[in-house]
């Protein structure tokens, strides 16, 4: 077994070559560039996973707690954190299996980024590829939309002179600059800074809520309605389903086989941010959060809050790049530009991908409810059901299990234990996440459309203050003047 793993490691060490280097082998002349730009270590992968996972959901989790109640909110975070870590592990196993098989066949991945749909194609055939491609691309499309909506929602709490739709136009143009980032190999400094930013924001939410104290007459009535309960649960499912970019992150690593437990450790860190912040904000504001899906809306405006807003804006730009970069790769492959040596040509070719994202963010600016809808309809399949089923079908034969590059952990019961966990995930997520969650999220989403309408200029903005006109002055007549 050890010899097999060493052989696999030798094969999978990889031939990753930077695409922005005009096809030349990676030759880093500048130590500064090496430090900030070229990342491929296990630490880089950990920062990427943790930074990408927590994103803007940090601001909507208190809203989910108001729908679920404190106890259910905490339990669902722990539960979906475990499930998400397991399916990320499955994706990493399938990637290593696929890449090992291909490199044993002397396939060269120079200037080519392996993606999830290609793993499914190589292991299970074109039908799996098509299903995986459809779900993955749709999820990443709406994941990018959510980041754009979050940018507009957050900046409004600093500058409300412009409505949220106008801010969406502005940040759509800003986020389009991510077309110049070649791959996940180049997110080293951004991932590091992104995690620092969300760490500050999480602890700001926690400390500010505790110092603020409970509002007068605070109520914690959740869970009050079944629809709200499953809507909140699917937002948490979405929170820990951020591993749709796992394959791309792994491919950027120098030793992808080291990824196996990285997502688990990233999740453990993320829980130290999400549990205290969501609990503290819900404790302080209670049911008020039901009508304020962004936690910033209820906290007093001061320098600390404004700083947190700015940091989250920068982080959402980074997360937009995380979600959109795999879409850039798919589009490049579709139009035959993926292996182009000119980064400028590839950047120009990527721009059409941003246009539908921009448009959808303007149509559906429902910050909060859209997370649950995407979670139930897309995340449930993309990062939970499909990876679990793919693992079962890839290793369904005894020969495939015997020749597998990576064996399941012994403490989980090897193949029997792994398949049992996979089956449980498929059934649970399909019934609870997609079934009940989809029903609840769609009802809530339609309610937002009925209440605010499509293309709404300023979702959940306070009504404008009506300034009363000055009193009309009447001329004073001296009735005794003519007497």
From Swiss-Prot:
Keyword Cell membrane: yes
List of glycosylated residues: 291, 478
The keyword Membrane is annotated on this UniProt entry: yes
Keywords: Amino-acid transport, Auxin signaling pathway, Cell membrane, Glycoprotein, Membrane, Symport, Transmembrane, Transmembrane helix, Transport
Cytoplasmic topological intervals: 1-53, 95-130, 188-190, 248-261, 328-350, 396-422
Location of the protein in the cell: Cell membrane
Entry GO CC: plasma membrane
Residue ranges annotated as Extracellular topological domain: 72-73, 152-166, 212-226, 283-306, 372-374, 444-483
Superkingdom as given in the UniProt entry: Eukaryota
Location (main, coarse): membrane
Membrane-crossing segments per the record: 54-71, 74-94, 131-151, 167-187, 191-211, 227-247, 262-282, 307-327, 351-371, 375-395, 423-443
Membrane protein topology class: Multi-pass membrane protein
InterPro entries: AA_transpt_TM
Protein name: Auxin transporter-like protein 2
């Amino acid at each position: 077994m050890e010899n097999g793993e060493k052989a696999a490691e030798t094969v999978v060490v990889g031939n990753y070559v930077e695409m922005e280097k005009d096809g030349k082998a990676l030759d880093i002349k500048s130590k500064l560039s090496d430090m900030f730009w070229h990342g491929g270590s296990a630490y880089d992968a950990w920062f990427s996973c943790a930074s990408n996972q927590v994103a803007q959901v940090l601001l909507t989790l208190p809203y989910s707690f108001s729908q679920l109640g404190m106890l259910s909110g905490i339990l669902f975070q722990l539960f979906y954190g475990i499930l998400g870590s397991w399916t990320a592990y499955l994706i990493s196993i399938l990637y290593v299996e696929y890449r090992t098989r291909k490199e044993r066949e002397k396939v060269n991945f120079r200037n080519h980024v392996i993606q999830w749909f290609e793993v499914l194609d190589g292991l299970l055939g074109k039908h799996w590829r098509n299903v995986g491609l459809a779900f993955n691309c749709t999820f990443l499309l709406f994941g990018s939309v959510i980041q754009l909506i979050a940018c507009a929602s957050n900046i409004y709490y600093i500058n409300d002179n412009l409505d949220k739709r106008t801010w969406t136009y502005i940040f759509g143009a800003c986020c389009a600059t991510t077309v110049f980032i070649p791959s996940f190999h180049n997110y080293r400094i951004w991932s590091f800074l992104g995690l620092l930013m969300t760490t500050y924001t999480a602890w700001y939410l926690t400390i500010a809520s505790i110092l603020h104290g409970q509002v007068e007459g605070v109520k914690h009535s959740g869970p009050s309605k079944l629809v709200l309960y499953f809507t909140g649960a699917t937002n948490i499912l979405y929170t820990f389903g951020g591993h749709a970019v796992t394959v791309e992150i792994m491919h950027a690593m120098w030793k992808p086989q080291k990824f196996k437990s990285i997502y688990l450790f990233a999740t453990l860190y993320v829980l130290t941010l999400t549990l205290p912040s969501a609990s503290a904000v819900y404790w302080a504001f209670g049911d008020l959060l039901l009508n304020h899906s962004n936690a910033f809306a209820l906290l007093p405006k001061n320098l600390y809050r404004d700083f947190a807003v700015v940091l989250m804006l920068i982080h959402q730009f980074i997360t937009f790049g995380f979600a959109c970069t795999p879409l850039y790769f798919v589009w490049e492959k579709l139009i035959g530009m993926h292996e182009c040596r000119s980064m400028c040509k590839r950047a120009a070719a990527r721009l059409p991908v941003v246009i539908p994202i921009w448009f959808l963010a303007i149509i559906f600016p429902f910050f909060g409810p859209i997370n649950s809808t995407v979670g139930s309809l897309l995340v449930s399949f993309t990062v939970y059901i499909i990876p679990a089923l793919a693992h079962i079908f890839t290793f369904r034969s005894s020969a495939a299990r015997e020749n597998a590059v990576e064996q399941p952990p012994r403490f989980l019961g090897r193949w029997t234990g792994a398949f049992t966990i996979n089956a449980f995930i498929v059934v649970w997520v399909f019934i609870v996440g997609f079934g009940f969650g989809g029903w609840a999220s769609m009802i809530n989403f339609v309610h937002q459309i009925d209440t605010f309408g499509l293309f709404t200029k300023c979702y959940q903005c306070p009504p404008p203050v009506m300034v009363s006109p000055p009193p009309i002055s009447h001329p004073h007549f001296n009735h005794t003047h003519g007497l």
